[in-house]
């Protein structure tokens, strides 16, 4: 019986481009291996993605009663979120706009 479990984190305060670098490393891997890679990755995105994967594992355990050892990351999608617009002061009384990027991380686990 094929089972799919999802976990979504919306509005993560990191750019989608940086998060996709981490997501590409764990796509298709078993849960134990994926969490091991995320634990030892120095990137900020790895910490955020790890939280989402752990949430998906908890969903599988609690909602579906799944065996964790059989699960793998079947899909991980990183979409661009809304940009927070901020201004920074420049010379001669001017200002420049800075966009603080956000992203939506969606993790799907299956057995």
Curated annotation (Swiss-Prot):
One GO cellular component term: cytosolic large ribosomal subunit
Family stated for the protein in its record: Belongs to the universal ribosomal protein uL22 family.
Single annotated GO MF: structural constituent of ribosome
Protein name: Large ribosomal subunit protein uL22
Keyword Ribosomal protein: yes
Pfam families named among the record's database cross-references: Ribosomal_L22
HAMAP family associated with the record: Ribosomal_uL22_B (MF_01331_B)
CDD domains (alphabetical): Ribosomal_L22 (cd00336)
Function: This protein binds specifically to 23S rRNA; its binding is stimulated by other ribosomal proteins, e.g. L4, L17, and L20. It is important during the early stages of 50S assembly. It makes multiple contacts with different domains of the 23S rRNA in the assembled 50S subunit and ribosome. The globular domain of the protein is located near the polypeptide exit tunnel on the outside of the subunit, while an extended beta-hairpin is found that lines the wall of the exit tunnel in the center of the 70S ribosome.
Keyword line: Ribonucleoprotein, Ribosomal protein, RNA-binding, rRNA-binding
Oligomer status and interactors: Part of the 50S ribosomal subunit.
Lineage: Bacteria, Pseudomonadati, Pseudomonadota, Betaproteobacteria, Burkholderiales
